[in-house]
């Protein structure tokens, strides 16, 4: 670019620049443009230091007071609620919504006592893993799924009913019935042994024996009979006897033992409600009832009993049987026992054993509501008689 002189004529290139009287050169700044005649310079000069270094101004450092702000709990709670709502909205949309999630928690004592694990450092230095902290990788044990056959086998085992596995049904020896006198039941008082243990005296300081003149008296012992010695030893043996659990015997064995022993024993025999036999004859009279008719006259109507009532009266019970022999007991070779009542056969089986005392008592009541009770004996065994359906069907077809 060529610059003009004060007269406005262009100067030759390389010529000397004219010096202005009012201008002063500043280091690092370009000279102001020459003043043209007829135009005044602007009051506010333009900032021509665009490419230069700005002048630094001093500003004092004021230390601000720090105020500890309390954590805002409400904001965090609101944020958590918003996040939960978003997660619920995400889970509720799309396929597979409502899937159960497994939350696995871990602690520092979950793996139990174990040796301290050591990890090698960069410079062959052992570092304890306890300082590092528990690992966040947890091995979740996968449960083995059962197959259809295994589940069916478990159901079969649960549905079994061919065994008794209830410890409460077993008879306890401590709950045995008490029978008087105690010699029959086996529970007797424990007698202390009268024989004293003779211990040798320890050797102590010698004492002077006192001389006492005692008259020497000798008693002649007579020899005892063997029967007396056996009687003396018998109660001691009976006192040490402890009753055992009742033995499970069949009906055939029980009847054989009763036939061989000389002692008499009472048996509890359970029979059906209706027994084969001739019911007692009763005069059936019709029931007369008086009914008032519309005309005001009394009419007598005869009513007969229903069929069910007549059948109930025609049944034979144990009270209707006559005294004496009722039936016969048959013991088969197989061990099966049957009771024959006329043409009807009843199967005889053992009843459930009771762990409490059962006694047969005869009660006699008088006219003045007073009476006597007599204990006839102790009942140990129970027999149940049930009808044999095979013989009933055979008799029906004939």
Swiss-Prot record:
Q: What is its main location?
A: nucleus
- One GO term (biological process): defense response to virus
Family annotation (InterPro entries) = RPC4 (IPR007811)
Q: Where is this region: Disordered?
A: 1-105
Cellular component GO terms held in the UniProt record? RNA polymerase III complex
One MF term in the entry's GO annotations: DNA binding
Top-rank taxon, per record: Eukaryota
- N-acetylserine: which positions carry it? 2
Q: Which Pfam families match?
A: RNA_pol_Rpc4
* This protein's UniProt keywords: Acetylation, Antiviral defense, DNA-directed RNA polymerase, Immunity, Innate immunity, Isopeptide bond, Methylation, Nucleus, Phosphoprotein, Transcription, Ubl conjugation
Q: Where is the composition biased (Basic and acidic residues)?
A: 66-100
As for PTM, the annotation reads: Sumoylation on Lys-141 can serve as a signal to mark misfolded Pol III for proteasomal degradation.
Cellular compartments annotated? Nucleus
Please describe what this protein does.
DNA-dependent RNA polymerase catalyzes the transcription of DNA into RNA using the four ribonucleoside triphosphates as substrates. Specific peripheric component of RNA polymerase III (Pol III) which synthesizes small non-coding RNAs including 5S rRNA, snRNAs, tRNAs and miRNAs from at least 500 distinct genomic loci. Enables recruitment of Pol III at transcription initiation site and drives transcription initiation from both type 2 and type 3 DNA promoters. Required for efficient transcription termination and reinitiation.
Complex and partners = Component of the RNA polymerase III complex consisting of 17 subunits: a ten-subunit horseshoe-shaped catalytic core composed of POLR3A/RPC1, POLR3B/RPC2, POLR1C/RPAC1, POLR1D/RPAC2, POLR3K/RPC10, POLR2E/RPABC1, POLR2F/RPABC2, POLR2H/RPABC3, POLR2K/RPABC4 and POLR2L/RPABC5; a mobile stalk composed of two subunits POLR3H/RPC8 and CRCP/RPC9, protruding from the core and functioning primarily in transcription initiation; and additional subunits homologous to general transcription factors of the RNA polymerase II machinery, POLR3C/RPC3-POLR3F/RPC6-POLR3G/RPC7 heterotrimer required for transcription initiation and POLR3D/RPC4-POLR3E/RPC5 heterodimer involved in both transcription initiation and termination.
Describe the family membership recorded for this protein in Swiss-Prot or TrEMBL: Belongs to the eukaryotic RPC4/POLR3D RNA polymerase subunit family.
Mind telling me what this protein is named?
DNA-directed RNA polymerase III subunit RPC4
Annotated source species: Bos taurus (Bovine)
Gene name as annotated: POLR3D
């Amino acid at each position: 670019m060529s610059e003009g002189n004060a007269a406005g004529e262009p100067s030759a290139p390389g010529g000397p620049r004219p010096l202005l009287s009012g201008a002063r050169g500043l280091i690092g700044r370009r000279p102001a443009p020459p003043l043209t005649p007829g135009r005044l310079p602007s009051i506010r000069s333009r900032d021509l230091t665009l490419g230069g270094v700005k002048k630094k101004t001093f500003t004092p450092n004021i230390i601000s007071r720090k105020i500890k702000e309390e954590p805002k709990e409400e904001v965090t709670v609101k944020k958590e609620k918003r996040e939960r709502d978003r997660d619920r909205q995400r889970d509720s949309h799309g396929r597979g919504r409502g899937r159960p999630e497994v939350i696995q928690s871990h602690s520092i004592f979950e793996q139990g006592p174990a040796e301290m694990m050591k990890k090698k450092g960069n410079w062959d230095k052992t570092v304890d893993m306890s300082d590092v902290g528990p690992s966040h990788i947890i091995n979740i044990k996968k449960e083995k799924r059962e197959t259809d056959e295994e589940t069916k086998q478990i159901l079969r085992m649960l549905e079994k009913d061919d065994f008794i596995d209830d410890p409460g049904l077993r008879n306890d020896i401590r709950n045995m019935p008490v029978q008087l006198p105690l010699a029959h039941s086996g529970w007797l008082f424990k007698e202390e042994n009268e024989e004293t243990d003779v211990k040798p005296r320890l050797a102590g300081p010698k004492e002077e024996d006192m001389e006492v003149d005692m008259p020497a008296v000798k008693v002649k012992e007579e020899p005892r009979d063997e029967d007396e010695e056996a009687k003396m030893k018998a109660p001691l043996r009976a006192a040490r006897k402890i009753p055992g659990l009742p033995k499970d015997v069949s009906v055939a064995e029980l009847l054989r033992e009763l036939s061989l022993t000389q002692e008499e024993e009472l048996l509890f025999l359970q029979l059906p409600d209706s027994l084969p036999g001739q019911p007692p004859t009763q005069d059936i009279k019709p029931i007369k009832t008086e009914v008032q008719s519309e005309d005001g006259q009394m009419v007598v109507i005869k009513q007969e009993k229903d069929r069910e009532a007549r059948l109930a009266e025609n049944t034979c019970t144990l009270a209707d049987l006559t005294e004496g022999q009722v039936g016969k007991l048959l013991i088969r070779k197989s061990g099966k026992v049957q009771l024959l009542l006329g043409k009807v056969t009843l199967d005889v089986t053992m009843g459930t054993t009771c762990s409490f005392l059962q006694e047969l008592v005869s009660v006699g009541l008088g006219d003045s509501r007073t009476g006597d009770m007599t204990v006839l004996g102790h009942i140990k065994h129970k027999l149940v008689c049930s009808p044999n359906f095979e013989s009933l069907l055979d008799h029906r077809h004939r």
